[in-house]
A protein has these predicted regions:
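Glycine-rich, highly charged phosphate/nucleotide-binding loops
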Residues: 73-81, 105-111
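A glycine-rich helix N-cap at a beta->alpha junction
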Residues: 80-94
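Short acidic-hydrophobic, aromatic-tinged amphipathic segments that line or gate anion-handling sites
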Residues: 2-12, 94
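N-terminal catalytic cores of NTP/NDP-binding nucleotidyl/phosphoryl-transfer enzymes
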Residues: 12-77
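Classical nucleotidyltransferase
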Residues: 104-211
Length: 259
């Protein structure tokens, strides 16, 4: 998968022959069950070598920029999202720095200047509730109208449901905040994970025969599940071990910071 860190950096690796793209766009936080339906459609449509698949996503999350008081937490770090998209088979990933200037693009400016002129769009595959353009005023019907105007196809994907409940990043965040890992993992389609660096603690566990490791999560926007005790599978280098994880403040040993 080729990774570009802005729209202006993007170019098709096609030996000088500009291929058209079949693309989708969004924040794709979690790359969950619903997202995968769209992403897999994109890859299926590019089995014909005339086209290349492309995902446009953004960092930081638009809500972090447009709602400065938002305390939204992310399901994925950038590295996690890249790995998940790569597993699906996406050929081109554009991670564009979202800022206020970008947010002021009108719907038509976005379509004409970016989708058509930069990405050479052949087809866009998008969720039914997608909104875009300044103040998110344009919807799927507007996108279809632009498709007719600029000669590209639009495929609309309906909401994906599990047990008659539509899957969304918001519902997964809620499940994690409630400590409902089973539901969160079902909606994600994989086990939620935390990645960090082991930091030295007070080493009290080893004195009673239960050595522990304190995990420092470096990305402060990563969602930490509800305080509690969880069964975990840990990957340390090439070694995988099972264990217990406590998220909380360790009041029995006067712990003052969350670990």
């Amino acid at each position: 998968m080729r990774i570009f860190h802005s729209i202006n950096d993007f170019q098709i690796a096609s030996g000088g022959n500009a291929k058209k793209t079949i693309l989708t766009l969004g924040t794709f936080d979690g790359v969950h069950f619903g997202h995968k339906k769209i992403l897999e459609k994109v890859t299926q449509n590019t089995e014909n070598e005339k086209y290349e698949s492309l995902v446009l996503t953004f960092f930081p999350h638009p809500r972090m920029v447009l709602q400065v008081d938002s305390d939204i937490k992310m399901l994925n770090t950038i590295d996690e999202k890249i790995a998940l998209l790569n597993q699906i088979g996406i050929q081109n990933l554009v991670i564009h720095p979202f800022d206020e200037s970008f947010s002021r693009l009108t719907a038509e400016e976005f379509v004409k200047n970016i989708l058509v002129d930069k990405f050479h769009i052949h087809k866009i595959i998008i969720g039914h509730d997608h909104r875009f353009g300044r103040n998110r005023t344009a919807n799927i019907d507007d996108l279809k109208a632009f498709g007719e105007q600029y000669d590209f196809e639009v495929e609309e994907i309906s909401a994906q449901e599990i047990k008659e409940v539509s899957v969304s990043s918001t519902k997964i965040r809620h499940a994690l905040n409630e400590g409902n890992m089973a539901l969160a993992n079902e909606y994600l389609g994989y086990n939620y994970s935390l990645t960090g660096i082991v930091s030295k603690g007070r080493q009290l566990g080893r004195t009673i025969g239960f050595p522990t490791a304190n995990l420092k999560i470096e990305e402060n926007f990563k969602l930490i599940p509800k305080n509690g005790v969880y069964i975990v599978k840990s990957v340390i280098g090439s070694k995988t071990v099972f264990g217990m994880m406590n998220i909380g403040f360790n009041p029995t040993v006067n712990g003052k910071s969350q670990t």
